[in-house]
């Protein structure tokens, strides 16, 4: 297997003999999903479909996906990490797949500095994740996209705060 990429500023490579491979495509773009065998019941079919759906939605909102393929891989722990053409997700969550895929635009394509311009990287990608979830699921999509932040907030935000979910997301990133 080999990949060639033009106009990328970062890359990653993953491998394990425990990966299961599935594939699909959207608009001529190859979609690959690699997931650990033990996560097969959760990931199978969902990861490819959700990645296809994410690339389609992001392409209609922010410009056509510029690469010939995208790979969505399972990773050891929760959360995710992104590179041009590759996202690593700690779950098969639709919101997480969209979020990490969104980084391909806001960080990947724009080549912005993730530290100096965090508002454009995490801030804008968090915004687009909520926008997608609301497009797909209506008003309840907002709650679906913020549920993990509410759990985190309860665990780590000990003092009494009066911030709403929408304010918390913008301040957190």
Give, region by region, the residue ranges found by the protein language model.
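Structured beta-strand-rich cores of soluble
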Residues: 1-28
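Hydrophobic alpha-helical and helix-loop surface patches within well-folded domains
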Residues: 3, 32-173
């Amino acid at each position: 297997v080999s990949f060639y990429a033009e106009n990328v500023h970062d890359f990653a490579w993953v491998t394990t003999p425990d990966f299961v491979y599935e594939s699909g495509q959207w608009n001529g773009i190859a979609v690959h999903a690699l997931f650990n065998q033990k996560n097969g019941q959760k990931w199978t079919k969902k990861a490819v479909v959700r990645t296809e759906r994410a690339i389609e939605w992001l392409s209609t909102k922010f410009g056509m996906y510029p690469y010939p393929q995208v790979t969505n891989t399972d990773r050891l722990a929760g959360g995710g990490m992104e590179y041009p053409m590759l996202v690593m997700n700690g779950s098969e969550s639709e919101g997480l797949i969209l979020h990490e895929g969104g980084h391909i635009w806001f960080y990947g394509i724009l080549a912005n500095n993730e530290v100096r311009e965090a508002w454009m990287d995490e801030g804008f990608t968090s915004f687009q994740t909520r926008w997608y979830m609301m497009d797909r699921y209506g008003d309840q999509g907002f709650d679906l996209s913020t549920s993990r932040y509410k759990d985190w907030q309860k665990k780590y935000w000990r003092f009494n705060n009066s911030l709403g979910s929408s304010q918390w997301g913008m301040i957190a990133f």
